Amino acid sequence: MHLLIPAAGSGRRFGADRNKLLLPLLGQPVLAWTLQAADQAQSITWIGIIGQPGDRADIEALVDQLQLATPVSWIQGGRERQESVFNGLRSLPSGAQQVLIHDGARCLATPTLFDRCSAALQTCPAFVAAVPVKDTIKQVAADGTIAATPDRSTLWAAQTPQGFTVESLLRCHRQGLEQQLAVTDDAALLEAFGLPVQIVEGEETNLKVTTPADLAIAELILKQRQFTAAIA
């Protein structure tokens, strides 16, 4: 399975002047945890890291340091995530038919999740890893008043990996760029053009590191995993 990792994370919310994926998390950069999990997954045979020129030297040095068994390629990103993924799709190895897209900031994804997602793509053409929403969600109007309370039983929180056939996702990205359609994840592109996308069970711990609080929570989860592994 081919895996694309968008890795152009801003450090703005951390008060940092560098990519948040290069910030330290329990002794190594955030991105290192993502790469190691993907490398340990039995199904992942190629990894493409999509980033910005200013981060290339640091990320390539990290890849060299990790000595991953899986081949890793650097791919030049675009101005926005959507354009970056499009560049990644066009840079896949010749003959690639299926692809997983995984945010580099979701550094707690496990090898088991990558393998489960790869297996799901063999039976459905497009999917999103997701978990059921636990909180009551309120739809709020522009003036701050509650407009609606959706039925929680129908709501899922989308994560990554998200999986697709290369042909369908590339076609939707081209159409999306032509129509200047802005989306927040790749599945939304397929949805916009009427293509079905299914849900695959994600992981509760598969959070996206966006704020300093997320980084602290991620460290606690990783410490717990290390403790559990040590006493097993």
From Swiss-Prot:
Q: Which residue positions does UniProt flag as site: Positions MEP for the nucleophilic attack? A: 152, 208
Sorted alphabetically, the keyword list is: Isoprene biosynthesis, Nucleotidyltransferase, Transferase
- The Enzyme Commission number assigned here is 2.7.7.60
UniProt keyword Nucleotidyltransferase, yes or no = yes
Listed GO molecular functions? 2-C-methyl-D-erythritol 4-phosphate cytidylyltransferase activity
What residues does the record give for site: Transition state stabilizer? 13, 20
Give the EC class as a word: transferase
> Catalysed reaction per UniProt?
2-C-methyl-D-erythritol 4-phosphate + CTP + H(+) = 4-CDP-2-C-methyl-D-erythritol + diphosphate
Q: In which pathway does it act?
A: Isoprenoid biosynthesis; isopentenyl diphosphate biosynthesis via DXP pathway; isopentenyl diphosphate from 1-deoxy-D-xylulose 5-phosphate: step 2/6
Q: Which InterPro entries does this entry report, sorted A to Z?
A: IspD, IspD/TarI, IspD/TarI_cytidylyltransf_bact, ISPD_synthase_CS, Nucleotide-diphossugar_trans
Q: Which GO terms describe its biological process?
A: isopentenyl diphosphate biosynthetic process, methylerythritol 4-phosphate pathway
The family database entries (Pfam families) matched by this protein are listed as: IspD (PF01128)
State the function annotated in the UniProt record.
Catalyzes the formation of 4-diphosphocytidyl-2-C-methyl-D-erythritol from CTP and 2-C-methyl-D-erythritol 4-phosphate (MEP).
Q: Which family does it belong to?
A: Belongs to the IspD/TarI cytidylyltransferase family. IspD subfamily.
Q: Which NCBIfam families match?
A: ispD
Name of protein = 2-C-methyl-D-erythritol 4-phosphate cytidylyltransferase
Question: Can you name the source organism?
Answer: Synechococcus elongatus (strain ATCC 33912 / PCC 7942 / FACHB-805) (Anacystis nidulans R2)
Q: What is the lineage of its organism?
A: Bacteria, Bacillati, Cyanobacteriota, Cyanophyceae, Synechococcales
Gene responsible for this protein: ispD
